[in-house]
Structure formats: structure tokens, C-alpha cells
């Protein structure tokens, strides 16, 4: 794993002044309190007092000491000098004449303010443990881990090491966390499952792509065949029995990351991986893909049912429009008959003859039949047209009942019973269903479901 992950900006800004501090930073890092002044005023000479004060405030702000104090922005030098009643900050050049003085002052600052070197125990160990925990539980980029480590070192008064030291440490920690994950994942499948995993990388005879590449492809259309293909993909993954493996204790985000990697990497590259890593990548892929394949199949089913319902509604509305004139004609004829029926001047004894004189009996009977045929109750939602769509449902119904395992909340127990009953009925030639669960059959469906008072199976 490469340690060269820092951006050029991160490398240039590490342990250096990037810009002048703002007011909040000045107050927090560069203000000298009574304790600071007591420590600083123990030094002889204004140049020594200014030099050690700048080293102290730089260590607070940057987390490290600078080899050349003239790299400190002039604004900060003037700000510190003013607090020490030094009118000419230029005397700092005298402080730079003796390196030993600068090193001695660094030692005094570390001792007085409890700063530690990066290699001091237990600080480096604590940082490694924190980095390892984050690398194990999350999928943070190494650049973010670098920023976290820098902030932690600054907060705990640990002097920053060289940037290369910190990047190398982060690379080693991430590598160790990855190898632990690969090792634990590779131990989960048994020998039969490992053979199945290796089979994913093979290209079946007569095919142009490997099984793994086929498993990556999800549904792209909404149709019965598309749902059947999605269901077959799910059952193939489920048959590998990875759902019975114990993935507890493994970070979910890392499993998803490995599975995503398997979905993008070339089959040849995965084939050339070491055994442990290859098994880990494929195990994570099958685990995640089994769940997503089921979700995709159910999504296709949901949209397919919605499409079937919409088609039935459109067909019903078109039928309604086509027959509207016939319905109007029959309704007007019946309205004329009802007008005579409501006329107080019509003799009740001769009512039938009066109606039939104006409206022939056969025409009246035809109109009644037409109204009964075309008029729809208010609670009807195109059930007849839904039944006409059964041919589309029949293509995938048996596979759905066989391969999908449904569960239900208490409110859906009746629906679940009906699904289980249909699954048991699959392949049966029974026409009259004496033992069918009838709780979900609502009013509008009863005229289509019941035959001679009993539930019937009209479609096969």
C-alpha cells in the first residue's frame, strides 16, 4: 500500500506557517499569560527572551519547532515582541547565531510545558491504536487519517515527526487492518464454498464473460423476463449459502467497500490476487450482492405490478370511453321510462301498457342489459381488466412463489396466508378451492372469484 498519499498542499503546509493567524488563533496560541512571562523572563537578553517566546508559541500553534525563526511571519514577531516590551524585533537575528541556545530552549520548553517527542512511550502506541481502530471500522482516506493524527498530536502536546514518518505509520496501520480483514473473511467459507467462489472467476463454455461479470449485471428493464432473470440471479447467489456464515464483528462499511471493489476490478486482476485477499474480496462480494440482488428483484416486481395495474386501468378507461355512447343511449331510454313511471297523471293499472306504447319492450330490455353490462359500481377499480392481465403475471408467478420467502407484520398475516396457499397450490389442477383463505377477498373481487358460492380458480 503506497505511503505517497499526501497532496502537494498538505506536504507544503505540514509544520509551517501558511498564513497569518486570525484573532481567535492569536488569543489562543500567541497570548502570553503570567506563567509564560515568568518562564520567558528567566532568560538573559532581549533576543533570548524573544527567541524562546517565539519557539513556545510556534510549538503551540504548529506542533513543532522551526529550524529558522525568521520563517515566522513578521506580524507574529511584532505581536510577541510587544507583549515582552521589546521595541525592535530585529534583535532576533542575534538569537539565530547560536544553535545550541535554540536546542537548549527547546528542551526547557518540553520540560516546563510537558511536551513529548513522537517516539516517547506511550504516545506513539496510543496514536497507533487510535489509527488502527479508525482504519478497521471505517473507510477513511489516508489523507483524512493524516489530518486526524496531526490534530491529535497537537492536542496532546506531541511534537510532530517528519511527514514521511507519519505517512509511513498510517500506511502500515491501514495495511495491517486490511490484512486482518482479509484473513478473517477468508476463514469464513468452507471448502465447498471456496470452490464456488473460484468458479465465479471462470468463463462457462460457450459464454463470453465470467460468472462474476454476470453477477454484477442488475436488471435494466421492467418486464416479466427481467424479473425472472433478477430472481434467478438472486437464487444463484443464495444457493452458495453465505447467509449462514457469521459476519459479526466485521465492520459493515469495510465489507461494502470490498464488495464495491469486486464490482469494479477486472476478473483477471482478482484472479492474480493472493489466495487470502481473493477469497476475502469474493466473500464480501457474494455477501453484499445477495442482499442487493434480492432488493433489485423486489424493486422490479414492485414496478412490474405497478405497470400491470396501470395497464389495466388504461384499458378500462379506453373501454369506458368506447362504450360511453351506448351507455348514454341506454340511460336516456330508461330515463324516458322512469319519467312515465313518475308521472302522476298516468293510470297505475295501465302503466306498463303506457310505457311499452312509447318504448318497445325489447328496446327497454336491451337498455337494461346494456346498463348492467357497462355501468360500474363506485368501488370497482378495473378488476375485470386486472384479470385480463393474468397472462403477464403467469410468466413469473410460479418462480416468485417458489424463490421468494415472504414475511409479514401482524396486519399482513392474511395476505401472507394467501401467498403461502398459492405456493402450495402451484401445479394443482383443482378448480374449486374449498380451503382457500378468503379474508383478503374484498367486495369488488367476489363476483370474479366465487363460483356457485365457493372460491374458484379460473386462470391457470
Predicted regions span which residues?
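Long amphipathic alpha-helical coiled-coil/heptad-repeat bundle
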Residues: 2-460
Amino acid at each position: 500500500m503506497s505511503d505517497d498519499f499526501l497532496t502537494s498542499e498538505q506536504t507544503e503546509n505540514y509544520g509551517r506557517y501558511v498564513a497569518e493567524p486570525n484573532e481567535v488563533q492569536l488569543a489562543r496560541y500567541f497570548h502570553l499569560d503570567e506563567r509564560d512571562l515568568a518562564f520567558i523572563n528567566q532568560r538573559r537578553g532581549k533576543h533570548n527572551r524573544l527567541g524562546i517566546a517565539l519557539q513556545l508559541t510556534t510549538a503551540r500553534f504548529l506542533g513543532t519547532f522551526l529550524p529558522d525563526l525568521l520563517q515566522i511571519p513578521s506580524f507574529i514577531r511584532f505581536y510577541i515582541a510587544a507583549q515582552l516590551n521589546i521595541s525592535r524585533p530585529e534583535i532576533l537575528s542575534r538569537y539565530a547565531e547560536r544553535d545550541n541556545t535554540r536546542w537548549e530552549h527547546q528542551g526547557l520548553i518540553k520540560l516546563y510545558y510537558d511536551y513529548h517527542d513522537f517516539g516517547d512511550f506511550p504516545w506513539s502506541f496510543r496514536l497507533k491504536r487510535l489509527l488502527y481502530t479508525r482504519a478497521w471500522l471505517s473507510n477513511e482516506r489516508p489523507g483524512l487519517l493524516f489530518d486526524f493524527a496531526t490534530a491529535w498530536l497537537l492536542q496532546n502536546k506531541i511534537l510532530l515527526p517528519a511527514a514521511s514518518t507519519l505517512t509511513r505509520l498510517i500506511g502500515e496501520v491501514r495495511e495491517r487492518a486490511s490484512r486482518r480483514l482479509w484473513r478473517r473473511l477468508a476463514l469464513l467459507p468452507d471448502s465447498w464454498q471456496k470452490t464456488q467462489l473460484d468458479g465465479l472467476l471462470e468463463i462457462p463454455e460457450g459464454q463470453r464473460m465470467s460468472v462474476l461479470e454476470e453477477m454484477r449485471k442488475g436488471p435494466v428493464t421492467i418486464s416479466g423476463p427481467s424479473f425472472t432473470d433478477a430472481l434467478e440471479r438472486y437464487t444463484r447467489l443464495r444457493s452458495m449459502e453465505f447467509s449462514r456464515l457469521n459476519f459479526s464483528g466485521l465492520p459493515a462499511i469495510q465489507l461494502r467497500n470490498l464488495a464495491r471493489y469486486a464490482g469494479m476490478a477486472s476478473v483477471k486482476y482478482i484472479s492474480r490476487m493472493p489466495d487470502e485477499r481473493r477469497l476475502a474480496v469474493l466473500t464480501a462480494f457474494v455477501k453484499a450482492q445477495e442482499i442487493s440482488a434480492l432488493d433489485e428483484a423486489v424493486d422490479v416486481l414492485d414496478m412490474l405490478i405497478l405497470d400491470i395495474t396501470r395497464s389495466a386501468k388504461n384499458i378500462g378507461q379506453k373501454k369506458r370511453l368506447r362504450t360511453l355512447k351506448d351507455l348514454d343511449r341506454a340511460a336516456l331510454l330508461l330515463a324516458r321510462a322512469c319519467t312515465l313511471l313518475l308521472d302522476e297523471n298516468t293510470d297505475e293499472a295501465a302503466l306498463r301498457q303506457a310505457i311499452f306504447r312509447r318504448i318497445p319492450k325489447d328496446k327497454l330490455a336491451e337498455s337494461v342489459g346494456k346498463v348492467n353490462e357497462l355501468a360500474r359500481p363506485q368501488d370497482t377499480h378495473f378488476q375485470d381488466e386486472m384479470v385480463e392481465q393474468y397472462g403477464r403475471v403467469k410468466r413469473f408467478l410460479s418462480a416468485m412463489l417458489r424463490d421468494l420467502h415472504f414475511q409479514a407484520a401482524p396486519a399482513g398475516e392474511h395476505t401472507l396466508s394467501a401467498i403461502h396457499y398459492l405456493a402450495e397450490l402451484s401445479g394443482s389442477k383443482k378448480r374449486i378451492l374449498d380451503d382457500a383463505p378468503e379474508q383478503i377477498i374484498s367486495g369488488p373481487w367476489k363476483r370474479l372469484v366465487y363460483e356457485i358460492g365457493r372460491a374458484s380458480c379460473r386462470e391457470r
